Every structure is written in C-alpha cells, then in structure tokens.
C-alpha cells in the first residue's frame, strides 16, 4: 500500500463522525431515524461574494416517538458532552438545539429538534452530509 492509499483510507474512516455519534446516541435512547438526504444550493460555505455550491444535507426524522420531549432532551444532553452547544431554544410544544464540532468550520454545524406538530410529534436531525 502506498502512502496516498493509506491517507485516503484514513479519510474514509474519519468521515461521518458526527452522524455516527448522533445515530449511536439516538439508538441508546430508543430513537429510530428515517434517513433522507436533500440537496440545497447555498453560498454559506463559500462566502457572500462567491458563487454558491450544491450541498447535501442529512435530514433524519423519527415520526411519532413515544416520549418525544424526554427523548429529545436526552439526545441533546448526550450530544452536549461531546459537541459545543451554540443555541438552545425551548417552545411550548418542544425545543431545538444547534451544535458545532469545530468553531472555524461552519460545515460541522448541526441541529436537533423535537416538537409536537399538527401532524404528530417528531424528533429530527439536520446537518451537512459527510461531516
């Protein structure tokens, strides 16, 4: 194996760390996410005067969990020990929290939301794919 192949293999092993941490913490709590990927055209990561790019986002949801509020808070608490919590909002019907892994890298920002909507309760995760 050459040096380039070892570096590429290491990049593959470390890719998806946030998503695997969220998935592992959710499984321990009893949350089963339905995983979807959506694409968004944005210039959030390139700069205000530069051309935008297509960015893939992981958009996971668990529809109709048993105790959405306690499970959502437990997931936020589990992730708070490892990631920096930027914002925590509480609403009458739920709440949300915004986390970041590295402050210098905006692609490592992700959101956990839990609420009761008109269509039923849900818990969701949204973040850049591959982070």
Region annotations inferred by a language model:
Residues 2-7, 19, 52, 117:
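Terminal leader/tail segments of proteins
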Residues 16-23:
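Cleaved targeting-peptide boundary
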Residues 124-131:
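C-terminal basic regulatory modules in eukaryotic proteins
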């Amino acid at each position: 194996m050459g040096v380039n192949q070892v570096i590429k293999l290491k990049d593959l092993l470390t890719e998806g760390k946030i998503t695997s941490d969220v998935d592992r913490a959710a499984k321990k709590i009893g949350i089963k996410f339905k995983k979807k990927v959506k694409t968004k055209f944005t210039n959030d990561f390139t700069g205000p005067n530069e051309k935008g790019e297509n960015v893939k986002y992981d958009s996971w949801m668990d529809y109709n969990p048993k105790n959405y509020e306690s499970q959502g808070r437990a997931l936020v608490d589990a992730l708070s020990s490892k990631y920096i919590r930027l914002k925590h909002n509480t609403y009458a019907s739920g709440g949300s929290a915004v986390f970041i892994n590295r402050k210098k890298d905006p692609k490592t920002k992700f959101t956990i939301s839990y609420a009761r909507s008109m269509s039923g309760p849900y818990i969701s995760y949204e973040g850049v794919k591959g982070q």
